[in-house]
Amino acid sequence: MLEFSSEVSLLDSVKNILLEYGLRFQEPQIEKVDKYIEELLGVPYNLTAHRDLDSAVHKNVVEILLPLKEELKGTLLDVGSGNGVPGLILAIFFSKLKVVLLDSREKSVNFLRGVIEKLDLENVSVVKERAENFSKERREEFDYVTARAVARLNVLVEICTPALKTGGKLLFYKGPSYIEELKEAQRAMKELKVELEKVREYSLKTGERRALLILRKYESSPEKYPRRVGVPFKRPLL
């Protein structure tokens, strides 16, 4: 049986969860997260189950911020952004970032544009395009490229790295099976000229284990990558 309550505001609930993890924030940031979570859940907080709220904040905010130990600034591309995670959350908490949310699905793009307008985010834009096309057209443009729950690591390396500047970093959010993905991504990493810089493992108080994989691009990727639309997914580099 789910419990409902109107006694605690969404704003206070988000604050309390972030404080449990020792995450720092400013009031305007929490206000934007407040609006974002409400848009994500699709209903006012007083009609939302505690369980839904707790899950949304952990999955879409805490999971993104917890492993980051440094300030992010410059340009960031979020590939397969979907509901805006991680790119939208990073844009809220790192004001010096200029973020591009990339997705090929009309529904996702419309949702993201609506949220950006409601949150009045000036450092975020949305592009409707396939990652393979975008990375080929916008080579060496971004300081960071990030993704979560889009594809396995070898596919991500191919479709994301060309858009990354040499010396830039890939930030990939993964689950506990990342070690297996790293093993199968060795060819892709070699071909696309990236190396593993570090892995930050962490756990949520809800029980989930997560890892942030940070890869650095040490040389320009060959012009032949990424391959045409769909090929990296159908025939990944192994």
Swiss-Prot record:
One Gene Ontology cellular component term attached to this UniProt record is: cytosol
Report the transmembrane regions from the record: none
> In which broad location class does this protein mainly occur, judging by the first location in its UniProt entry?
cytoplasm
Identify the residues that bind S-adenosyl-L-methionine.
80, 131-132, 148
One Pfam family hit: GidB
Question: Keyword annotations for this protein?
Answer: Cytoplasm, Methyltransferase, rRNA processing, S-adenosyl-L-methionine, Transferase
Provide the GO MF annotations for this entry.
rRNA (guanine-N7-)-methyltransferase activity
EC number annotated for this UniProt entry: 2.1.1.-
Q: Where in the cell is it found?
A: Cytoplasm
Where does the source fall among the domains of life?
Answer: Bacteria
What functional role does this protein have?
Specifically methylates the N7 position of a guanine in 16S rRNA.
Sorted alphabetically, which NCBIfam families does this protein's record hold? rsmG_gidB (TIGR00138)
Q: Which family does it belong to?
A: Belongs to the methyltransferase superfamily. RNA methyltransferase RsmG family.
- What protein name applies here? Ribosomal RNA small subunit methyltransferase G
- Annotated gene: rsmG
